Amino acid sequence: MARRLVCSLVPVVTTLIIACSGSSSDGTGSPADPNGSSGSSGTSGSSGTSGSSGTSGSSGSSGGDGGSKGAITIFTIVMENHDYAEIVGSPDAPYINSLIASYGLATNYMDSGVHPSLPNYLTMISGAPQFGGGSDPLPQAAPFPVTQQNLGTQLEAAKIPWKSYQESMGTACKLSNGTPYAPKHDPFLYFTDMQATALCAAKNVDYGSFAADLAAGTYRYMWITPNLTSDGHDPQTAPLTGAKNSDAWAAIEIPKILASTAYKNGGVLFLTWDEAEGRAGHSKDQIPMIVISPNIKSPGFTSGKPYSHKSYLATVEDLLGLPRLATVMSEPTMTEFLK
């Protein structure tokens, strides 16, 4: 006897989950992206890494991009004292320009507007210069250390493994000058929550340990500052060889990062300069910001949107699923460079 197959329609119920969050009491929260691009992927409610902070489903960029474009490892390399025109298209920087052609370039990226070096480094991790500039005091000289939330504070609170690598630092957490090392190029040293604790020696180390840490894949945020010979800072007199020096260093060290599993598995490398040269005939504040990632939107991608060192901090926070500091709450995010 033939068996009859009886079919019926079963309705499918779709549930829309909307998670909302407001600013937290410490001045951090989840901002809206002024670029209007953070929610374009339509995945702001995804299960990204930012869920633990309570912002993964928010309408702002720290939730949307933190979930949909979250980077597993973020690398940051900061060079010294060259404006945009001194690097982009320069014959003195062939390797760096090859990176620009293959990855992404922010063509309207600015330093903090406060000089010399130190205020720019501090802005990159705290969203503010922290003092009026005009000099580069040591980490233990007034008005430092300062008590202010910063990226190090956030990474520790979120239990995200990280380190700051300083070429030629020698002794970990070194607070004094030692040619060719300068503590003013390690901004994490200038905050009370780092300088006065055992974290200082654990997190601020000589660049010599970077290769082993990179191979181990332990850390999700890795800040790198080349020494005073390699960072591109021009000598006081001609010939000005800084761009050649930084390009030579980059040509040796950056390929090691690009060959690593940490980079290949969703990594993002930000290569930038602390401040513009400021000499006659040069831009006062415009500097290169090169975004390098296997997930770059397209080879040679460029954006003329107005970005700055504050945007860098906001972007790192978004990619790692961290709530934004109040100092960068309304800053645009550079996640448009990523797929």
Language model features: what each stretch is:
Residues 16-67:
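Ser/Thr-rich, Pro/Gly/Ala-heavy low-complexity intrinsically disordered linkers and tails
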Residues 22, 33-36, 63-339:
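N-terminal pro-sequences and low-complexity stem/linker regions of secreted or lumenal proteins
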Residues 1-19:
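Sec-dependent bacterial lipoprotein signal peptides
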